[in-house]
Amino acid sequence: MDYKRKSNEQIGGAQASEDRRTVVLDIETVALDPSNEKGALDAMTGRAVCISMLADDGKAAKEITLAGEDEARIIAGFWDALRPGDVVVGHNVLDFDIRFLQQRSWILGIQPNRTLDTRKYYTADVIDTLQLWTNWSGNKKGVTLDALGSALGCGRKTGEGANVAQWWAEHDIDSIKRYCQDDVRLAYRVFCRLTYQEPRQLALNEGQLFTTSVMEPTVNRVAEVRLT
């Protein structure tokens, strides 16, 4: 059997489509109260400061990174970036990233332009590499993105999430963006390994980046990056 022919469409249980993209997601959050570090993990006590996506349309991959002080704009930008056929991918994305964004959307009064089906064992809308690895067993201890990336030969994380709060306090948005983008690239490589695919090269000039501390979005040139 040629295992490399298996694709995320097969794993997700849906047919391939020109409109269907794999959108790898990672978010960074901070506590509303800086003295409560664990508050960053709960949508009632934390907020999103960066959302990074890597969209693979079967031909090329491009990055979209939304970061800054205007959380409502960041989250609305995430929902607007999703297309109807997109499959959202990430590590622990079901229990954290998507849940957090949905809950913050309720709090901020943002209506998503689509509903992601996050039912257990259902992978047409969302594929979680953590659940893929553990086969929904609930035995998640030690299965971090860093550990899984290392075990699969995909690389390791380039920083620590604990640094995000400090960067935020120092208004160092660029460091938060770089850290979030590096995580999303690692998650993409892990997903490709688990689904027997080759990571695509990041498309030149296709990365959209805006920081909400400025009035208008700016599109930045993205250097050609080999994701393998």
Feature-to-residue mapping (PLM):
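Metal-dependent phosphoesterase core characteristic of DEDDh/y 3'-5' exonuclease domains
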Residues: R20, G46-K62, V87-R178, D182-G207, ...
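Conserved "right-hand" nucleotidyltransferase catalytic core of DNA-directed polymerases
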Residues: Q208-T228
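Short linear clamp-binding motif
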Residues: M1-S7, L204, E224-T228
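Aromatic-residue detector
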Residues: K4, S35, A40-T45, P112-T115, ...
